[in-house]
């Protein structure tokens, strides 16, 4: 949730737990479209978070929990401080215990009115709260309890929220993500520099025209729009965590068109950079 250099995020889970678990305290962040080879679970405890999963936009608030499937494009925006439980479970780890994982997606509708599903979701969130407690307190032998709770969570995820999908769809989606992965990695390494269309198309081993169509189809925006949104994520972070002048921050992250920056910033955050800083008492 908190902004860091992400496009295709590599989840390096600790060997003693095989998952990444933490209580996220986010002062404010914007993370553009990215994905990781892990199931991501976000359970809001304070504040709110704007989320986009593929083409669906929604806001989660205190008490809401969402499950984002692995290899699914998503973005998040936190415009005021929030606190959440964040759990990322690598697909490689899950596949050891769920052999048909590649044919499944997990449907966890936090807005459901179905009482049976609400009860199952409450049980799921209770395990997350127990994980948080044991992770914070860490008594002797805490890993025994922590890992047992992870397996209980996976059992519930598999039995209560898994839905089978067509194998052909998942196979093509994996091929597309494998092609997109080096592109987003390249952008994360060179986003401060001008990147030409021909340059980035070569990374994907595609002709420029086809690359444009492919990128827009998969990401929902053009390559240039994505590059500017990626820059914007770091600009927003620096804006709310430093006193550096706006023009210095823009130059640091390679955003050279100030007029375009102001328009994009206003569209994303509803205020000018000066207004955002005043709200956060940075000025």
Question: Where would I find each of the regions flagged by the language model?
Answer:
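Solvent-exposed, amphipathic alpha-helical segments
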Residues: 47, 123-137, 179-190, 234, ...
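Short, Lys/Arg-enriched, Trp-marked, Pro/Gly-tolerant hinge/linker segments that flank
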Residues: 110-120, 135-146, 155-189, 193, ...
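Hydrophobic alpha-helical connector segments
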Residues: 150, 245-246
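Generic protein-terminus/edge-of-domain signal
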Residues: 1-61, 65, 72, 78, ...
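A hydrophobic/aromatic-rich effector-binding and dimerization subdomain
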Residues: 2-22, 70-136, 154-166
């Amino acid at each position: 949730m908190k902004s860091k250099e992400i496009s295709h995020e590599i989840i390096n889970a600790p060997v003693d737990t095989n998952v990444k678990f933490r209580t996220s305290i986010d002062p404010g962040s914007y993370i553009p479209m990215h994905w990781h080879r892990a199931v991501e679970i976000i359970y809001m405890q304070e504040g709110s978070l704007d989320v986009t999963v593929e083409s669906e936009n929604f806001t989660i608030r205190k008490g809401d929990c969402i499950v984002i499937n692995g290899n699914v494009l998503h973005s998040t925006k936190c415009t005021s401080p929030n606190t959440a439980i964040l759990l990322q479970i690598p697909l490689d780890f899950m596949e050891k215990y769920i052999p048909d994982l590649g044919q499944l997606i997990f449907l966890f509708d936090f807005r459901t009115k179905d009482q049976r599903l609400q009860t199952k979701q409450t049980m799921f969130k209770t395990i997350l709260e127990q994980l948080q407690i044991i992770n914070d307190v860490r008594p002797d032998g805490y890993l025994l309890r922590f890992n047992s709770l992870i397996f209980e969570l996976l059992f519930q995820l598999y039995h209560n929220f898994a839905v089978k999908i067509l194998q052909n769809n998942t196979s093509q989606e994996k091929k597309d993500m494998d092609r997109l992965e080096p592109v987003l990695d390249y952008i994360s390494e060179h986003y401060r520099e001008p990147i030409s269309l021909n340059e980035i198309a070569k990374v994907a081993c595609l002709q420029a025209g086809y690359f444009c169509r492919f990128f827009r189809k998969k990401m929902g925006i053009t390559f240039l729009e994505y590059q500017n949104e990626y820059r914007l994520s770091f600009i927003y972070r620096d804006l709310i965590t430093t006193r550096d002048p706006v023009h210095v921050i823009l130059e640091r992250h390679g955003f050279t068109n100030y007029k375009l920056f102001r328009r994009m910033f206003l569209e994303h955050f509803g205020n000018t950079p000066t207004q955002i800083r005043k709200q956060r008492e940075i000025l």
